[in-house]
């Protein structure tokens, strides 16, 4: 805990700077930095993230006590620079209070504007500015925001709208008006009175009038918001540790709602949706910042180019656009020129795409925030590659700029062009976040989460989203909002999550109570299907067919760049030629796991497999296996051909035999009829296969050692397919993997069968195919005796699913009964079946690699469990010297990027 808890900034000076984000949060550090490089920023101060942790450890009263002196002095610092006084009716200073963690968490925590107003100060503000409407507009906004954030005024149930919005709608209805800026001073005064009455009625206390009491309430509310439900969920999604805490930034208010020469807006130095190098953003005249991001009013475009593009998307002609929806470039050309110059300066300074908030107060431009902007996966890759081409960053930085998991977004399906041509367009909104989404309509976040859990794909439809909707946005395939622009909460958060989003669709009328949405005359109910095109803003009736994405352009260039630096190769887990082909197009350099058992479940194959299981003698088993042989050979032929010239690691039969027989009465009757035996015979045989703990029973190499004819048949199928391919001019590279070895003698026995069978095939065919025999290290004993096992194994493949299961003693199938509790209580930080346990399982891997290579110097080692596509696990594999990781086809690019990052981070 540092002794200094508060850092001031203003007038070109600052006690902090950009590299202090851990202490000051991203917002506080960047406000300090902007001061230092000459960007106009209202003066203020930042309370450190350490105080947030102190707040939760020691409590509110203790924190207020230790902060009082520094906060009082810092308020005086703002008063001196602004030449006004906090709480003084004759010359009032108003403040904003905002959160700011070290990692950007847009909309997840709380903000209060116009703090310091009461019935006396508002009159002084009106007199000082000569603008009574502005003063009371600021006052009603403050009471509304403070009532929500600090005093907890929320809707009583989810179908109700915000209690303050209900009052606003009532006043507008009485006056026959639609827009906030049409309200008179008398209307605004009525709102303040009614807001205060509602607060007194719902929470039982009067609205606080003392400005310092208001300030402490706001500071504590921001700290408290670090632990609100949506912030916790967002941290979990983004991997942000709880102990980081949030800073609190207090600033002098500058006002975008002082009249027609004032405005507020949000802008990006590049397109956060597609990554294009185009300055873009939105603004509202005579408004405050929260109006833009909350989506309460659909704002106008900052640039002329952006405005014309918006008009084209919305079907607005040029004359109407110019008169009713002009760009800032047209209406405030001098301010626009300053804004454009500063956004360019900030991007050049930070060498990354910037997301900026600004206010224009009576013709003067102020910056309230800059941060590295949230972006889609597509934009992430394009921006990194463009900055590299422009010389702003080097190759290593470009690789490190990309988040491996966000590459997943580039691999999502896209709408099929033929299906789109047939689809019925209902309306068009703003293309807030690209992607293709189809699903059933839901209106509430909790319903979206529940429907998703039940296996439904959903589209969440809202008037506008708020941070409370995060859980629903996470569960939904896409989001549609009636209000809000390209910089609204829905748009920013959707882009950050890689979710398809269409915002500000004017033809959409949502009725929460009836759970209906009317779209240009078509009424749809909860559960009806809807499709969204986040790249064009089009909304379609029903479901629209999709097709797989392709690796092209900047993505392909990034992957090529990764290959330049990576040492760890990436294979795929694939059981069919189709999966193998997909993985190969994504850059896989072989198959790290081909599971033979997955091939047995088709009709004719499962029948032959069951015949083998029912057999009582070796002769009968061999007859059944002869029936299976051509099927297996055909399967291996397809995969080896698809991966021509690349290694294909084929695991011999692994699961216990009971998995191949039916356990229900109906299935057993059908099997008896098919096999021409009695139901009782089937029942007895199934019962005889039953084990108390089948995952530790007769499976893996134990099957092959108990029934060696199974291993012999599979070897014949693998090498028979390889020989056929070699005769046809191909270059098959089979690897035969013996699973679940715990003792070197188990492998010794299996290797002898494989080699003997191979020699017979090669002699009979007159052709030899080079192949390797290896083992899966998935039992702790195998890892600890790896030096012995390496005397027989030509390679190791770590089966981290079972190795994790046996090291922890956790059943992968049953962990759900206690995992949520373990994660909540911090007994476990992560699910060890998703993220490799480096302290335990990882040490077994490290030991096995070291011991194995003492026996066999050039021993090839890889992993093929689910961890092979998880970025932190991939980086661990690089550090312990593995040759490759293997993962599902669609995780291959993610693993390639993570492997390159591991190599770059080591340089």
Q: What residue spans do the PLM features occupy?
A:
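Long, charged amphipathic helices and adjacent flexible linkers at domain junctions
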Residues: 237, 399-451, 457-458, 526, ...
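Short beta->alpha connector loops at strand-helix junctions that form conserved
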Residues: 45, 482-484, 503-506, 594, ...
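S4-like RNA-binding module at protein N-termini
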Residues: 507-540, 545
């Amino acid at each position: 805990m540092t002794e200094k808890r508060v850092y001031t900034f203003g007038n070109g000076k600052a006690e902090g700077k950009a590299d202090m984000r851990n202490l000051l949060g991203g917002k506080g550090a960047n406000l300090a930095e902007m001061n230092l490089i000459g960007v106009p920023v209202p003066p203020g101060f930042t309370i450190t993230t350490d105080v947030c942790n102190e707040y939760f450890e020691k409590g509110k009263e203790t924190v207020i006590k230790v902060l009082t002196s520094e906060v009082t002095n810092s308020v005086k610092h703002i008063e001196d620079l602004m030449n006004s006084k906090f709480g003084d009716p004759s010359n009032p200073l108003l403040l904003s209070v905002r959160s700011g963690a070290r990692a950007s968490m847009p909309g997840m925590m709380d903000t209060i504007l116009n703090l310091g107003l009461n019935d006396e100060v508002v009159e002084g503000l009106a007199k000082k500015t000569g603008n009574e409407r502005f003063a009371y507009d600021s006052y009603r906004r403050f009471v509304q925001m403070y009532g929500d954030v600090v005093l907890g005024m929320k809707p009583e149930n989810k179908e109700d709208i915000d209690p303050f919005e209900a009052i606003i709608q009532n006043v507008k209805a009485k006056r026959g008006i639609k827009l906030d800026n049409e309200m008179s001073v008398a209307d605004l005064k009525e709102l303040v009175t009614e807001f205060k009455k509602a607060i007194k009625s719902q929470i039982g206390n009067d609205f606080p009038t003392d400005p310092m009491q208001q300030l402490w309430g706001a500071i504590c509310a921001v700290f408290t918001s670090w632990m609100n439900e949506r912030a916790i969920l967002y941290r979990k999604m983004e991997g942000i540790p709880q102990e980081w805490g949030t800073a609190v930034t207090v600033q002098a208010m500058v006002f975008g709602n002082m009249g027609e020469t004032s405005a507020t807006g949000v802008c990006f130095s590049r397109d956060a949706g597609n990554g294009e190098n185009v300055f873009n953003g939105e603004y509202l005249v005579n408004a405050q910042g929260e109006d833009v991001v909350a989506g309460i009013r659909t704002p106008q475009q900052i640039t002329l180019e952006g405005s014309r593009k918006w008009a084209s998307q919305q079907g607005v002609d040029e004359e109407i656009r110019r008169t009713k929806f002009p760009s800032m470039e047209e209406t405030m050309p001098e301010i626009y020129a300053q804004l454009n110059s500063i956004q360019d300066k900030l991007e050049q300074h930070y060498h990354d795409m910037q997301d900026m908030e600004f206010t224009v107060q009576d013709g003067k431009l102020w910056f309230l925030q800059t941060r590295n902007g949230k972006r889609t996966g597509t934009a992430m890759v394009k921006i990194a590659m463009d900055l590299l081409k422009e010389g702003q960053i080097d190759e290593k930085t470009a690789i490190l700029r990309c988040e491996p998991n966000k590459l997943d977004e580039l691999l999502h399906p896209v709408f099929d062009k033929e299906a789109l041509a047939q689809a019925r367009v209902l309306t068009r909104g703003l293309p807030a976040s690209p992607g293709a989404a189809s699903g059933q309509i839901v209106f509430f976040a909790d319903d979206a989460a529940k429907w998703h859990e039940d296996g439904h794909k959903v589209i969440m439809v809202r008037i506008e989203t708020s941070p409370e909707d995060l859980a629903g946005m996470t569960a939904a395939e896409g989001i549609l909002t009636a209000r809000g622009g390209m910089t609204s909460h829905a748009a920013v958060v959707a882009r950050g999550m890689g979710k398809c989003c269409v915002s500000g669709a004017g033809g959409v009328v949502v009725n929460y109570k009836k759970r209906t949405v009317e779209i240009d005359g078509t009424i749809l109910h909860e559960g009806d299907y809807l499709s969204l095109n986040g790249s064009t803003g089009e909304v379609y009736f029903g479901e629209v067919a999709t097709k797989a994405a392709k690796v092209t352009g900047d993505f392909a260039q990034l992957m090529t760049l990764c290959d330049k630096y990576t040492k760890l190769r990436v294979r795929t887990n694939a059981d069919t030629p189709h999966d193998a082909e997909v993985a190969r197009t994504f850059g896989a350099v072989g198959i790290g796991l081909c599971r033979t058992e997955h091939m047995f479940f088709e009709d004719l194959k499962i029948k032959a497999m069951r015949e083998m299981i029912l057999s009582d003698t070796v002769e009968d088993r061999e007859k059944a296996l002869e029936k299976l042989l051509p099927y297996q050979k055909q399967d291996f032929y397809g995969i080896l051909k698809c991966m021509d010239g690349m290694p294909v690691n084929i695991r011999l039969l692994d699961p216990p035999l009971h998995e191949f027989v039916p356990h229900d009465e109906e299935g057993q009757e059908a099997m008896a009829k098919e096999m021409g035996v009695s139901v009782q015979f089937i029942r007895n045989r199934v019962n005889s296969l039953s084990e108390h703990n089948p995952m530790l029973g007769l499976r893996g190499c134990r099957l092959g050692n108990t029934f060696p004819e199974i291993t012999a048949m599979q070897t014949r199928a693998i090498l028979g397919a390889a020989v056929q391919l070699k005769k046809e001019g191909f270059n098959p590279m089979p690897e035969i993997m013996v699973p679940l070895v715990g003792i070197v003698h188990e492998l010794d026995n299996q290797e002898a069968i494989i080699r003997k069978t191979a020699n017979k095939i090669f002699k009979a065919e007159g052709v030899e195919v080079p192949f390797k025999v290896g083992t899966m290290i998935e039992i702790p004993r195998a890892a600890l005796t790896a030096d012995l096992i390496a005397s027989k194994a030509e390679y190791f493949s770590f089966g981290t699913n079972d190795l994790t299961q046996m090291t922890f003693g956790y059943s992968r199938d049953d962990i759900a009964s206690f995992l949520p509790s373990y994660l909540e209580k911090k007994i476990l930080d992560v699910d060890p079946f998703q993220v490799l346990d480096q302290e335990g399982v990882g040490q077994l891997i490290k030991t096995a690699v070291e011991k194995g290579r003492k026996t066999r110097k050039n021993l090839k080692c890889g992993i093929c469990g689910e961890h092979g596509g998880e970025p932190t696990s991939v980086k661990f594999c690089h550090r312990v010297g593995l040759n490759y990781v293997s993962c599902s086809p669609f995780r291959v690019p993610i693993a390639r990027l993570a492997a390159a990052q591991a190599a770059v981070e080591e340089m």
